[in-house]
Amino acid sequence: MSNRRLVIAGTGSGVPKTTLTIGLMAALKQAGYRVQGFKCGPDYIDPTYHTAVTERTSRNIDSWMLEHDMVREIVARASQDADISIMEGVMGFFDGKNPLTNEGSTAEISLITNSPVLLVVNCASMARSAAAIVKGFQQFLPEANIVGVIANRVGSEGHYKLVKAAIEQECHIPVVGYLKTNDELTIPERHLGLIPSIERGELTPFFEQLGQLVHDTIDIEKVYELALAPKIEINDPIFTKPSVPQVKIAVARDAAFNFYYEENFELLKACGAELVEFSPLKGEMVPQDADGLYIGGGFPEEFAETLAQQIDVKNSVRAAIQKGLPTLAECGGFMFLTDGIVTTDDTCYEMVGLIPGQVRMQTKLAALGYREVTGKPGNFLFKGDIQAKGHEFHYSTFYSEKEFSPAYDTKGMRGMKEEGYMNNNLIAGYTHFHFGSSTKMVENWVEQCKAAKKERRDAV
């Protein structure tokens, strides 16, 4: 296992951490290193870039949704055959679940994993003041191991030298390089953040250009040197090897549905599920021998016209759920199962039609934040009076004129609310779950799939 890992932390959002992280990954890979990516927090989109540039599946590490031991194990497992791990932070270094603690922050992740930190500082229109910013971050949480700085948005090499001299004199840590303002290399954004790489097609030229830019102005070998960290010890592994498959769960996965945590898949496999992917966008049906169905989040609204035209696919999904497949649909998957998606131009696209009501897109954020979740009575995922953690992030609202059964009670910063839709074997809602927050959910789902499979066989 590699003992080199580095947290890329920003003084705030928009530094920009993601562009720099991708550039560092590309430059390290070009230098011959095997790079493993991680993303602090629940975001699905940035890891798609990490995965594309490193050619290794990037992992989310979230210290609010997951127990600290699980965070450490995820890092240790994924880093086993890597030369260096790059962990992209979220928001500002100390920003997390609430403003009064470090819970869920990049800083907390750095402490949990005992990882050195490279601080990215926006140095536009300042020189010595940059040192004051860095010193403030050092003193705010002295136990955080900030080992170096990257100066971002510098105006020239001369400007960089001023910033570097001030920081190194006052803060006693190296400034390992800089990036100039370069709008041409800014990754485009959209209502859910960065466009998933799966939609952008061929990204190799972009990665190469960004990697070369980082190589030209950042000391990559110094970065590698600073990444040396203590080995993470795992005493009682949570993740186990996949067991012999007992049920088959179909997973909708393409450009419209691609928001999944890799650990969710691994926990399902460890519990006896074989996962079979299909693409609704490409006209692929739910596999006939599937015993369960998982439709994750994504951008169905961006592909609403194409999805609306996939009549056979919609019939296939509807028939699979109606015949009893235990189904979980999260956010985009939930939207897909409604009567229709109404886009911001008031065009309505017909969807599967199993959930009575429509989803209406809007320009303003409808919901954002972590959720503590309990299931409503009859929710098979929550058998045994369990709780789970997840998050919401969407620009749409669900409207229905019919009575229906919510799937969950969720608790966020604004209090409790009922959320989602439940009907027998169908559980759907805006909430994205990390199964690592409650592995019992996985056991419940697989057991429900086994029971449904037996019931169908007995009926033959």
Curated annotation (Swiss-Prot):
Cofactor requirements of the protein: Mg(2+)
Stored CDD domains: CobB_N, GATase1_CobB
GO biological process terms held by the UniProt record: cobalamin biosynthetic process
Database matches in Pfam families: CbiA (PF01656), GATase_3 (PF07685)
UniProt-annotated catalytic positions: C331 (nucleophile)
Catalytic activity field: cob(II)yrinate + 2 L-glutamine + 2 ATP + 2 H2O = cob(II)yrinate a,c diamide + 2 L-glutamate + 2 ADP + 2 phosphate + 2 H(+)
Site (Increases nucleophilicity of active site Cys): H432
Name of the protein: Cobyrinate a,c-diamide synthase
